[in-house]
């Protein structure tokens, strides 16, 4: 996306402090521990990814939808809106902002119903419960909570520039790109600028592919390497968690622990 990141609402309003983020989560962390909380967000990032792929959206749109989802819950408890409703709402909004084209509401609902039945039946025993009016109402609430700050800068563009500057081949770009996609399952998109995330993902890819010759190139970068290493640790921790996590066995239990909205008082 063209424009100056440093003058954007992404830079000025949506690079959050880690302590503030943890403080906002305290209510949810009464019901879920930190690992469980992260697993819930990994699951819903996967839901957004599957819905996006079935709608044939570009990865940029899927990534923006995932960032909207994480931004909303950075300021709100999970009990405020059912994540299963917010996920398709974020996709609908991201497709508009990223100028992908209009997704028909009926098609979105149909894809949600199909995905829950075929891809996520291990998590949900009932059908997708929401209709168009729920998603449109949720979209207003989402816009309000994002302060209408809808332009999201992603790490993909700086990653392309870095790989070109490094003079490396497609294999490195392909792996780095996948790691950027994986990074959306962590908090790094809320805490760090996209160019730092791109550098961290590129560094992980170089280690995996044993590109020892790139060490000098990284050393000469004008970047806060401590921040880059924090991002690397967050992504490596994600991979460590993934190794041992049996999602299909655990997710129903985790979803049942999510705090639910209180029903309105009976009149």
From Swiss-Prot:
Where, per UniProt, does this protein localize? Nucleus
Is rRNA-binding one of the keywords UniProt gives this record? Answer: no
CDD domains, alphabetically?
Answer: CYCLIN_CCNC_rpt1 (cd20513), CYCLIN_CCNC_rpt2 (cd20514)
Pfam families xrefs? Cyclin_C_2 (PF16899), Cyclin_N (PF00134)
Q: What is its main location?
A: nucleus
Q: Name one GO cellular component term.
A: mediator complex
Q: Which residues form the Cyclin N-terminal domain?
A: 48-151
Give the signal sequence positions: none
Top-level taxon in the UniProt lineage = Eukaryota
In its UniProt record, a GO molecular function of this protein is:
cyclin-dependent protein serine/threonine kinase regulator activity
Give UniProt keywords alphabetically. Activator, Cyclin, Nucleus, Repressor, Transcription, Transcription regulation
Q: Which GO terms describe its biological process?
A: regulation of transcription by RNA polymerase II
Q: Is-annotated flag, keyword Nucleus?
A: yes
InterPro entries assigned to the protein according to its UniProt record, in alphabetical order: Cyclin-like_dom, Cyclin-like_sf, Cyclin/Ssn8, Cyclin_C_2, Cyclin_N
Function, in words: Component of the Mediator complex, a coactivator involved in regulated gene transcription of nearly all RNA polymerase II-dependent genes. Mediator functions as a bridge to convey information from gene-specific regulatory proteins to the basal RNA polymerase II transcription machinery. Mediator is recruited to promoters by direct interactions with regulatory proteins and serves as a scaffold for the assembly of a functional preinitiation complex with RNA polymerase II and the general transcription factors.
- PANTHER family documented for this protein: CYCLIN
Please give the subunit comment from the record: Component of the Cdk8 module of the Mediator complex.
Family statement drawn from the similarity comment of this UniProt entry = Belongs to the cyclin family. Cyclin C subfamily.
**What is the protein name stated in its UniProt record?**
Cyclin-C
